[in-house]
Amino acid sequence: MRDGVRHDEGVLMPAASAPAPASWESAVAWLVAQPGQTDLVRACYYDRPLAVAARRYHASEEWAAVRAMLPTSGGLALDLGAGNGIASYALARDSWRVVAVEPDPSAVVGAGAIRALAASEGLEITVLEGAGERIDVPSASVDLVFARQVLHHANDLRQLCREAARVLRPGGMFVAAREHVLSRASDLPAFLREHPLHRLYGGEHAYVLRDYRTALRDAGLVIVRELRPLESVVNFAPLTRASLRRELQSRLRRLPMGLAAARLLDHERIYDAARWLAARVDDRPGRLFTFVCKRPA
């Protein structure tokens, strides 16, 4: 769970002259140390102490929207590609029993950070170090697999989706949140050039929508909901509904006759309809989608 923010969401980017750190941990350390990058660091939940960042994520509009999609009964949740553990924290706070799977052992951005966070906050989070393509969890044992910004990092997208499906109980849910999508494969170089964190370490990727759908369906999962870029705060965070509205209104006011159109967005139904329409014409390379899937019962 590395790339916490899009380059066009009003957050500062690292300078093009940034060095090439040897690890993701050192890349994040470099970013945190840069003057003027506070907004980006907070948007990625890399600010310290980690417990404060995790609490902010749990209280965010993004997590509230995720929570609304999840089963209400709780159960066993697997946080796939858990990063520094903010989603594991949120799940545990919401009374899920949590297994966090993270390949990076880092005490800053990986498994070590999750263990320290769980200990400091008194939460029971089981941490497994390993890749999502081979999860050390029994088949049909998990009620929920949650993966925030993970699928586009997979070494093998199809295998990762197969593993997520394997560990789910029949009727279980898989949520793949904030996945970078391309309209065409040839857009990938442009996306990587503009991504604010790819410059620091690499490791970013994106797929065309068909590739995600095929990988999920071939794994035996049913896609029950597909959230486009501006349809849900899950995708347009760190903006909130209110701040996105202000941004859209500001852009409209610059257009001829735009003042009246901007005022119309004060009406919730019109604002929601405008976001729905914009989500269907959005062609930005790397725009964010969320996939809500179930394993058939």
Q: Where are the model-predicted features located?
A:
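A conserved beta-strand element that flanks and buttresses the S-adenosyl-L-methionine
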Residues: 146
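Class I SAM-dependent methyltransferase SAM/SAH-binding core
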Residues: 84-134
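Conserved class I S-adenosyl-L-methionine
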Residues: 4-72, 74-83, 90, 173-198
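Acceptor-substrate binding/catalytic loop of class I
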Residues: 195-211
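A C-terminal cap/extension of S-adenosyl-L-methionine-dependent methyltransferases
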Residues: 127, 225, 230-297
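A short glycine-rich, Lys/Arg-flanked "PGG" loop and its adjoining helix->strand segment in the class I
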Residues: 158-170
